[in-house]
Amino acid sequence: MVKIVHGSVEKMPFSDDRFDLVTAIETVFFWPDTAKNLNEVYRVTRQGGQFIVINNYGDPSIDWEKKVPCMTRYTAEQICGFMKETGFVDARIAKKGNLFCVAGRK
């Protein structure tokens, strides 16, 4: 059974240590406060659970932040650093073309 819950990364409507896997696909660039929001992801991830971010860099010739004012682009390396600062371990990066994946474990 699948249950759809509406919420925000700013304050997720879930208990602590709830999920074995948390994903953020094409969303991190739009988070209002990345450091604070990563703490919220960490809170809902179980010990030993994983957090995976998948993003597309998009066309590098476009100034995305100007075109989409609520957007802040980060490199895979920046996101990996944010994850490590939050407490995720074994953070690693995989890239293919304009796509990147950053994964870490709690």
Located regions from the model:
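A short acidic, Gly/Pro-enriched loop at the edge of an enzyme's catalytic core
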Residues: 10-22
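Core SAM-dependent methyltransferase catalytic element
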Residues: 86-91, 95-106
